[in-house]
Amino acid sequence: MTLALCHIPPASLTELLPKELSHHLCIADVIIRTDNADYARFYRRQSQAGKFVILDSAAFEGECTSPQILSAAARIVRPAEVVLSDDPTSATRTLTMSQECARIMRERGYAGRFMGVPHGKKLREYTQNAADLLEACGVSTFGVVEEIPETLGIPRAEAVSVLRSLFPAIDIHLLGVSEDLNELTDPYLLQQARSCDTAKLIVWGLQKTLVAPGDVPPYPGREALGGRMQYFEYVTTDVFAWDAAIANIETWERVLCAVSSGAS
């Protein structure tokens, strides 16, 4: 297994993503906006073409996405997997929110896979939350957040290793990558995680910045393009900026293949 990258573009630039990408992640709040019909159509077509499309909330973007919004977006996109609601500050609240989200989505006809996002202040609480999500919600995937080193005090790869040992049949998805992109050159993570989402390579590219292993510049953040949510509304006709974004994507797709091949 080689990790698949889900690149997150602004709504206006989805059609320029490389056609060979096998996995995608889209945001429910952007899907249901009537002014983003092209964004919704793009991800619906990816689902119809057999690509693995993950539907996520806009929690990272600072929005409070309801299960009703997730359900409405799921009816449009027909994703392979939906990320259940969570609360990064509370394992108990995460379980309650995920159960409610899963219940509402099933009642509204969603029959696909769920991704649960475990949380905890200690490793034991974290793994118990993962076990509870598996039992209560029937999740097929665990989403491992980028902030693991800050919340648990261990490397992200260690959290993945623990989940792998306890739940070998459950897929792992990395929610975001760190600003130094170290996850994308870690042979263990590339072999053990199914997929990973990030907007970083595109954000750098739209700033006309090329990024390669050993040459990772400071990350400007989505704020450079308007903000976390405003990023999806970003529009540019600068072909040099998009060429740089595509170059970053292609560079790191080659890196993933090379590192994974060397580890196998």
What are these regions (language model features)?
Residues F42-Y43, F52, F60, F114, ...:
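Phenylalanine-focused residue identity feature
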Residues M1-E15, L70-S71, Y110, E135, ...:
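Alpha/beta catalytic cores of nucleotide-metabolism and tRNA/nucleoside-modifying enzymes
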Residues A73-G205:
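Eukaryote-skewed repeat-based solenoidal scaffolds used as protein-protein interaction platforms
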Residues M1-R106, D243, W252-S264:
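Non-catalytic, usually N-terminal nucleic-acid engagement modules in DNA/RNA processing proteins
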